[in-house]
Amino acid sequence: MSSAVDATGNPIPTSAVLTASAKHIGMRCMPENVAFLKCKKNDPNPEKCLDKGRDVTRCVLGLLKDLHQKCQKEMDDYVGCMYYYTNEFDLCRKEQEAFEKVCPLK
């Protein structure tokens, strides 16, 4: 895996990309995720929560694009390590540290 985005600059949300970005997703997309989970809890009909699900997807894809623009090399290195080691955080701490230094959690 050479990049976390395709040729047009759109994020490719693979498991390695999502795992590497999980802390950032949790921070930035919390309101959208909470609204979606509340909707799912209150109404078991999946159709009722599609708009909230789209909000979560939009937030995550926007975040991934922002992260890739801000810290492309570090993100690609971290994602590549996670991909190579099947999402084992312990084996990618060096890449994680470099990624979080350039793209800190806010």
Swiss-Prot record:
Cited Pfam families: CHCH
Motif Cx10C motif mapped to chain: 92-103
Entry GO terms, CC: mitochondrial intermembrane space; mitochondrion; plastid
Gene Ontology biological process terms from the UniProt entry: mitochondrial electron transport, NADH to ubiquinone
Motif Cx9C motif 2, residue numbers: 49-59
Span of the annotated motif Cx9C motif 1: 29-39
Sorted UniProt keywords: Acetylation, Disulfide bond, Electron transport, Mitochondrion, Repeat, Respiratory chain, Transport
InterPro entries in the cross-refs: CHCH, NDUFA8
CHCH domain location: 26-67, 68-106
Subunit architecture: Complex I is composed of at least 49 different subunits.
Role of this protein: Accessory subunit of the mitochondrial membrane respiratory chain NADH dehydrogenase (Complex I), that is believed not to be involved in catalysis. Complex I functions in the transfer of electrons from NADH to the respiratory chain. The immediate electron acceptor for the enzyme is believed to be ubiquinone.
Protein name: NADH dehydrogenase [ubiquinone] 1 alpha subcomplex subunit 8-B
Species the sequence originates in: Arabidopsis thaliana (Mouse-ear cress)
Phylogenetic lineage: Eukaryota, Viridiplantae, Streptophyta, Embryophyta, Tracheophyta
